[in-house]
UniProtKB/Swiss-Prot annotation:
Catalytic activity reported: L-alanine = D-alanine
Biological source species: Clostridium perfringens (strain ATCC 13124 / DSM 756 / JCM 1290 / NCIMB 6125 / NCTC 8237 / Type A)
CDD domains, per the entry: PLPDE_III_AR (cd00430)
Cofactor or coenzyme needed: pyridoxal 5'-phosphate
Keyword Isomerase part of the UniProt annotation: yes
One term under GO cellular component: cytosol
Taxonomic placement: Bacteria, Bacillati, Bacillota, Clostridia, Eubacteriales
One GO BP annotation of this record: D-alanine biosynthetic process
Alphabetized InterPro entries for the sequence: Ala_racemase (IPR000821), Ala_racemase/Decarboxylase_C (IPR009006), Ala_racemase_C (IPR011079), Ala_racemase_N (IPR001608), Ala_racemase_pyridoxalP-BS (IPR020622), PLP-binding_barrel (IPR029066)
Protein name: Alanine racemase
């Protein structure tokens, strides 16, 4: 791929992203859709993905850290953006001036935000997190938590935009715990209402709940992995959403050689040829997000066939056995993650090998890997991060 700084790239089909979001919009109806684009939009590239999601049904965005929000604002995105995690108070002026909605789960922090906002003659917009069973961040849904949230709602420099929780098991078949979490949130909100507090945007549904639990939608939903075409688990009702992965990871063959029988490949001599073999070297490794855990286990698609990754994956390179494939040469295109002509090796397959989840596979693709964006099968943009 001549338009990239190196022969490794991720192709992102923006039409597929658009279709995934339209599917989500059709499912949730008129509810607010908060599209989660943290971690560089799960490895897809936040700027172009965010715009596409907003154009096709999303009304809001969510990120994890202040720099992710700044990137979106600097690119001219004006849609509401919430930060799901912690932001140091020294960034308060940035939050307030850029109208970034900060998650709050500590009274003293909220007071400091309020003070900063009053000095600027503005209000800090916040979402209040309630820990209904994730055990991560948020006020506990008890009397003490209620009193703290009521105190935050009374602060003169704070505008409470949202109240939310995060489900920990909504992608599992047994929804009992998710229903318990949901009940705690709705009971907490009722207690606020009984105290004269109305928060306009209540949201709890993540990808698993969006697919399986429409009764948890409240005022809005937060879609993450499903925007990118992957299901959160194998236990959700896939028939509720027709999704397609938008990202394909590709490279070109960098070298081809023949090795005699009983010759070793890569570090540690973990692979030895059993016969005369043809080995191709690919210019991608674990520094690119192609994990060392794939050593000797993954496969790629080349010339319409599968080829096995052999030996240990190196920092910048790995090797495949192409003995069974004719006429493999330098420059041939290889699919490391994706599908072609009925052959598939995607983030789910990779995650199974590595003992992880498809989310991590996508997020691992590093900034060394250029992103190529396509619409109508035409390249519309290329990003070389480094």
């Amino acid at each position: 791929m001549d338009i990239c700084v190196r022969p490794v790239w991720a192709e992102i089909d923006l039409d597929i992203i658009a279709n995934n979001m339209k599917e989500i919009r059709n499912l949730v109806g008129e509810k607010e859709i908060i599209a989660v684009v943290k971690a560089n939009a799960y490895g897809h590239g936040a700027l172009d993905i965010a715009s596409t999601l907003l154009e096709n049904g999303a009304s809001r965005l969510a990120v994890a850290i202040i720099t992710e929000a700044d990137e979106l604002r600097d690119a001219g995105i004006t849609a509401p953006i919430m930060i799901l995690g912690y932001t140091p108070i020294n960034f308060a002026e940035n939050l307030i001036n850029n109208e970034i909605e900060q998650t709050v789960y500590d009274v003293e922090y909220a007071k400091e935000l309020s003070d900063f906002a009053l000095k600027l003659g503005k209000k800090a917009k916040v979402h209040i997190a309630i820990d209904t069973g994730m055990g991560r961040i948020g006020f506990l849904p008890n009397e003490e938590g209620l009193n703290k949230v009521l105190e935050i709602c009374s602060l003169p420099g704070v505008e409470v935009i949202g109240l939310f929780t995060h489900f920990s098991t909504s992608d599992e078949k047994d929804k009992t715990y998710t229903y318990e979490q949901f009940s705690k949130l709705t009971a907490f909100n009722k207690a606020l209402e009984d105290n004269g507090i109305h928060i306009p945007l209540k949201h709890a549904s993540n990808s698993g709940a969006i697919m399986d639990l429409p009764e948890t939608y409240l005022d809005g939903v937060r879609c993450g992995i499903i925007s990118y075409g992957y299901y959160p688990s194998e236990e959700v009702k896939k028939e509720n959403l027709k999704l397609k992965p938008a990202l394909t990871l590709k490279t070109n063959v960098a070298f081809v050689k023949e090795l005699d029988e009983d010759m070793y490949v890569s570090y540690g001599r973990t692979y030895k040829t059993e016969k005369k073999s043809k080995i191709a070297t690919l210019p991608i490794g674990y520094a690119d997000g192609y994990s060392r855990l794939l050593s000797g286990k993954a496969k790629v698609i080349i010339k319409g066939q599968f080829a096995n990754v052999i030996g240990r994956v190196c920092m910048d390179q790995c090797m495949i056995d192409v003995t069974h494939i004719e006429d493999v040469k330098i420059g041939d295109e290889v699919i490391l993650l994706g599908e072609e002509n009925g052959l598939k090796f995607d983030a789910n397959d990779m995650a199974e090998i590595m003992g992880t989840i498809n989310y991590e596979i996508l997020c691992m693709i590093s900034h060394r890997v250029p992103r190529i964006y396509k619409k109508n099968n035409e390249i519309v943009k290329v990003i070389n991060y480094i």
